[in-house]
Design a protein with these regions (language model features):
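"…together with the soluble PPM/PP2C metallo-phosphatase catalytic core" -> "…together
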Residues: 1-147
Length: 147
């Protein structure tokens, strides 16, 4: 869902309100998948929704600088790969495919003298943000540790 809305936003600009509503709905669906919507402390879920939607938009804003989206994504994916070997919180193929995808993107985005061949756009940066947030959420749930 979020990929489709972001794709449309890349083709023709959507109002911020439409994008934010779609992002919140997608995050609620992710929280449902993570099975954290039943928490008795509803305010924690609301705060987590705001933080996660904000984090996904921060990654989207970084896409305009060559290599920064890929660099930050890899700096999260490599530790997640190592932690997954120990805790097994997601299927390892999800991390491997995500890492390889970001590495290929990095090849075209990180170029000398600011001449990037491509950018992720909204569809790429928001999608990778949601994938990273999903994996981090699974890790937090598996280890019950937020630090």
């Amino acid at each position: 869902m979020i990929g489709g809305v972001s794709f449309i936003d890349d083709i023709r600009s959507l109002p911020d309100s439409v994008r934010l509503i779609a992002q919140f709905i997608a995050m609620v669906m992710m929280f449902y998948q993570l099975d954290i919507l039943h928490l008795n402390m509803w305010w924690v879920v609301v705060l987590a929704l705001i933080v996660c939607v904000g984090a996904s938009n921060i990654i989207n804003f970084m896409d305009g600088i060559n290599g920064i989206t890929a660099g930050y994504s890899l700096s999260v994916l490599f530790p997640l790969m190592l932690l997954n070997e120990k805790f097994g919180f997601v299927d390892s193929s999800l991390i491997y495919v995500s890492t390889l995808s970001v590495l290929v993107f990095c090849f075209f985005n990180l170029r000398p003298k600011g001449k990037a061949k491509c950018f992720a756009g909204d569809v790429g940066s928001i999608s990778i943000a949601y994938i990273l947030l999903f994996m981090i959420g699974k890790l937090i749930i598996k280890t019950t540790d937020m630090t």
